[in-house]
């Protein structure tokens, strides 16, 4: 009887360990989130007129394990509603040579994926456009949802910081400051390793 109790306890212990191992999350699964259809907008203006460029082709990844944040948009997918203005924008940005605007950096604030409320977060890294990179810090909100992560952020870009000459007509120039907004839902990346 003593041996059967030992075996029974060993089986129970092994079963308990197996259950615990099954419910411990694997680091890479559920820690990485990916989108290919995020939304980006930028607002700009000339005297007496403003306009917005929009793309729903923002590609991005957030890896909570490593705190990696990487987003980019092909500038050819940004539309302002006027074809000539779109072509002028691409020419100004030298998009044939530098087609992407990208942010690559780290989440530098705390984020609790167990909390389902929007949380203020801060990222820091390199933003690159027009072939020029600058270190920037961006504040936004990140929320864990049933679909994955929901991100919203905005910041202001100064074209001079990226060697972009604001286009203009006659005496009017586009404002050097561009307001940028992004929003995206990032489902879990089930192919993460």
Cite the ranges covered by each PLM segment.
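Bacterial N-terminal signal peptides that target proteins for export
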Residues: 2-15
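Bacterial N-terminal signal peptides
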Residues: 14-27
């Amino acid at each position: 009887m003593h041996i059967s109790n030992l075996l029974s306890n060993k089986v129970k212990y092994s079963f308990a360990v197996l259950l615990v191992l099954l419910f411990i999350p694997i680091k890479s699964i559920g820690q990485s989130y990916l989108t290919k259809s995020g939304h980006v907008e930028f607002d700009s203006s000339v005297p007496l007129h403003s306009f917005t460029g929009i793309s729903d082709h923002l590609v991005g990844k957030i890896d909570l394990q490593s705190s990696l944040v990487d987003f980019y948009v092909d500038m050819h997918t940004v539309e302002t509603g006027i074809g000539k203005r779109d072509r002028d924008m691409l020419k100004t940005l030298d998009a044939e040579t530098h087609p992407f605007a990208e942010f690559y950096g780290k989440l530098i604030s705390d984020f609790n994926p167990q909390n389902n409320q929007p949380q203020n977060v801060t990222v820091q890294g390199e933003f690159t456009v027009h072939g020029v990179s600058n270190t920037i810090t961006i504040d936004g909100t990140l929320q864990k949802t049933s679909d994955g992560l929901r991100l919203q952020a905005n910041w202001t870009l100064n074209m001079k910081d990226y060697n972009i000459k604001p286009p203009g007509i006659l005496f009017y120039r586009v404002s050097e400051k561009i307001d940028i907004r992004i929003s995206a839902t990032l489902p879990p990346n089930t192919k993460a390793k």
